[in-house]
Amino acid sequence: MYDPARDSWEERDGDEARSLRGRLASDQPHAGFSSSEQIYGASGENNNTTDLQHPGPDPKTTASAKVLYAESPPAQSTTQTPPSISTHVQSPVNPAAQEASNTQSLTSAAQNQSNKSTTTMDNTSGSATPKPRADPSDKSNRPDQVASPTDQNGSQGDKKRKVPAEENASEKSQPTPDRPVSKRKRMEERHQKLRKRGRTPPSAYSRRDADETASAADRNGPTYRSTSPLPPPRSPTPEDQPRQRKRPGGGARMGLVDRETLRRRQEERERAQVEEAMRASQGRGLADVVRQHYNAVPQRGREWRKTESKIKGLRSFNNWIKSTLIQKFSPDEEFLARFNGTKDWAEDGGVPPVEEKRLLVIDLGCGKGGDLLKWQLAPQPVDLYVGLDPAEVSIVQARERYNGMKSGRGNRGRRNPIFHAEFQPKDCFGEWLGDVDIVQQVGIDPNVGPGGSVMSSRWGGGGFDVVASMFTIHYAFESEEKARQMLRNVAGCLKKGGRFLGVCPNSDVISARVSEINAKKKERQSQAKKEKTDEAPEDGEVEEDDGKVEWGNQIYRVRFPVTTPEDGIFRPPFGWKYSYFMEEAVEEVPEYVVPWEAFRALTEDYNLELQYRKPFLDIWRDEKDDPELGPLSERMGVRDRATGELLMTEEEKEAASFYHAFCFYKV
């Protein structure tokens, strides 16, 4: 019996007997009238019109209708009543003709149903444990059974679930009392049977739970790792040769070597460390010496340099030479073409227009900032000045001088607004300038020089208009690497058409002095062999028996600690060190010869073309009558206003002849 409230089938006592009687009754098409009343009664709950139109059908017709209604498939209809009954009720034809046609159709359907029931009984009787099958038509004979209502499509609820023949056979083999009472228990039993037959793939949640269970089992229970094969048994160590136990490391093997070998190895390691330290110190030794020297130079004011200095004439002359270089070569070609032949920029009241292009200048070896005022008086205004120097104390003093210029102190002769300046300690020849922040912002080309790209050599370049190096490049010729690093920094900072201005010792003067002294020394040695007497050296020359060369006067002195070439040609061009002394300025600082031809050949590798080169005294003779530079020399105390003579002693002139100035263009 189907209970809609519990959604289950319940069997009562005597159901099997009634099922058997139903099967026997199905063999007889005209069993009785009571089943017909139940069918019409069940349908009458949903359709009252049927009961009114058929108050009492005959037994033959109702029995056939019962069999047809139970076994025929559901018809597709949108009504809630069985299609066959509703059609029979609502037909408007003659009742006598309709009754005859219904009787014929129901009789044929009853005969087909009787054949099917007979076949079913034969198949069931052949099983090992026969069990009578309950006929669906017999459900109408039960007084407490209510016909299952049809769904919207006309199908009945008892026809929804179909059980295969194998499951029916297995269920029939089980005893009736052990069968689950509810549908839920039967479904669980069925699922258990299906799980025994074949395992379905687990869901994601089951795999997750299985992983957690497995991890817990790994922690708490025995592991299921495969057993690895056992290692082969080791042969026992002979007792007469026990293994000697030692600490790990090289120290454990020291006992195997004699003490003399260990001492010799230790000495070799110490000697190698000393040599490496010497090589490292040689690379930075000169820069350290120069840095310490210039940091120790005391700061003297302008008044002392003009009154008490012993070399005040030489100081003024050197400053005038640097001003001449800045005035002649710092402006670009456009600026010079605009004022060509007019020298309007020389007038104090001639302020350049506001839209005029301003210069970007970097000074390699700026020292204490002694050239700041010279750049402030440049014909083309300066927008940015970057000062680099290896001496930290000099950088501090240069920054203080610049701050004094900004505040109004020392603005003598200034006709342009003060430029922006930045200072930073830096080894300009031994290190790459690309790591300086302000240089990176302005621009520096790392691809200049040999090995650079062709496009960089033609179109590349830095962002500075002028690179200045006053009295400094001779420190770079300690080695070829330093010299090339210096030129790489210069060429990398310069833009196309930029100028490289500088002042350095004149190698022609050094070569002439060295060859002259060596010739006199050789002549004296030849005369000494004849007379066996030594002649006193001439004035200004000092000769030593060990072959060293030295010359100078009371103001300056040059001394070579090594043997110099007899002809005065320095080969190779790098590493020819000498000591230079300048009164009140330089105290025996090591410097290096800058062979000019070798230097010019190196500059060609970095796209630097020589534009100007002259000794100091030649520059004076050429520019002393210039309308701008001539009066400037008088204001700087280089020339006497009354006589026009150069205000320097002969010793100062000799010291000034040791230098020359140059200018290269970036092409």
Swiss-Prot record:
GO cellular component: nucleus
Gene3D superfamilies found in the cross-reference section: Vaccinia Virus protein VP39
GO molecular function: mRNA 5'-cap (guanine-N7-)-methyltransferase activity; RNA binding
Entry's localization field: Nucleus
UniProt KW RNA-binding keyword: yes
Annotated spans, Disordered: 1-272, 521-547
Keywords for the protein's UniProt record, in alphabetical order: Methyltransferase, mRNA capping, mRNA processing, Nucleus, RNA-binding, S-adenosyl-L-methionine, Transferase
InterPro entries to which the protein is assigned, alphabetical: mRNA_G-N7_MeTrfase_dom (IPR004971), RG7MT1 (IPR039753), SAM-dependent_MTases_sf (IPR029063)
Main location as per UniProt: nucleus
Record field: compositional bias (Low complexity): 72-87
Enzyme class, first EC level, given as a word: transferase
Annotated Basic and acidic residues bias: 1-19, 132-142, 256-272, 521-535
Family under the similarity heading: Belongs to the class I-like SAM-binding methyltransferase superfamily. mRNA cap 0 methyltransferase family.
Function: Responsible for methylating the 5'-cap structure of mRNAs.
This protein's name: mRNA cap guanine-N(7) methyltransferase
Gene coding for it: abd1
